[in-house]
């Protein structure tokens, strides 16, 4: 039997999920199994872990929204075979958890996704990248795509930051020792 707080959290998650599913239809975002998210919301140990995690992160998002985003991110990482801790380290490195961040090169949001990449690879519009759920979805899908094209995590991270074409030209010594990769690993 669910208590009032669990009903509320489930309602919030299902509302968020319905928005995500709507965006799936219009923006080709992935559909995450409802049971996965409902299980994460209903399991007090899992929910508590995400609450603790959210409290430890200094973010532009409020703690409740951040907790829900972490649950979503974790489920999405499972769906795409991307390491959840690595994604959090990329977010910390790229934007320090500021969902409104815009870089000098025009990259947007938590995972600092370039609008050109979002549009060409995932049919996602520039302004949609300010939505943390869309931004994280595109970032994780892109990391998964890069992971399938490179042999190791250092090359994948370098490609995420510098682009896949440029990364293929770098020596393995540069890739393992570049500043971006070191910063991401420091944030693990």
Language-model segments: residues:
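N-terminal Sec-pathway targeting helices
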Residues: 1-14
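Catalytic glycan-binding domains that act on GlcNAc-containing polysaccharides
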Residues: 27-188
